[in-house]
Regions:
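Interhelical loop and helix-boundary elements at the membrane-water interface
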Residues: 1-12, 46-74, 103-135
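Helix-coil boundary and interhelical linker segments in multi-pass alpha-helical membrane proteins
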Residues: 19-34, 75-94, 142-148
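Alpha-helical transmembrane segments of multi-pass membrane proteins
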Residues: 20, 37-46, 70, 79, ...
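Short hydrophobic interaction/assembly module
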Residues: 28-55
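Final/C-terminal transmembrane alpha-helix of multipass membrane proteins
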Residues: 130-147
Length: 148
């Protein structure tokens, strides 16, 4: 979060690379990581509230755990849904698509992403807008798998 330009994009990219390493180098089960992300979500609700308590900006750029959580959702669910070996180039293509889509939804904030961003000036709003952006990515991937 201390990177001056586009810290959210850097956090999302770092998350994407980190998850690729966990899933495809260390071969960690995606269910374990998804469960960990859920735990991190609840811990972050508390931790982010403490961090932003005295700040006027309730969604500071220094807080990037929300990008980690939001970017992790589609990647973990992709890995759970595709539990068969795939070629690395195909996996990297989908990871890249998930990264780009997440950034688009996180930046443009279509409803309900914008709803959480505007109406909850607390840790719940900080994190839930990214969770919704991640769920939009999941929805697009599901539609892709159904129709293509």
């Amino acid at each position: 979060g201390k990177i001056k330009k586009v810290p959210g994009s850097f956090a999302s990219l770092a998350t994407t690379l980190f998850l690729f390493f966990l899933f495809h180098i260390l071969n960690i089960f995606p269910n374990i990581i998804l469960f960990s992300v859920i735990i991190i979500f609840f811990i972050s609700l508390y931790a982010v509230d403490i961090f932003i308590k005295d700040l006027t900006n309730k969604d500071p750029k220094e807080v990037v755990i929300d990008e980690f959580i939001g970017q992790s959702i589609p990647i973990c669910l992709y890995e759970i849904a595709h539990n068969i070996p795939k070629e690395t180039d195909q996996i990297l293509k989908f990871y890249f698509i998930m990264f780009i889509l997440f950034r688009i939804f996180d930046i443009t904030k279509p409803y309900p992403v914008s709803y959480y961003d505007k109406n909850f000036k607390n840790s719940f709003g900080v994190i839930m807008d990214d969770v919704c952006a991640g769920l939009y990515v999941v929805a697009i991937l599901v539609l892709y798998m159904i129709f293509i």
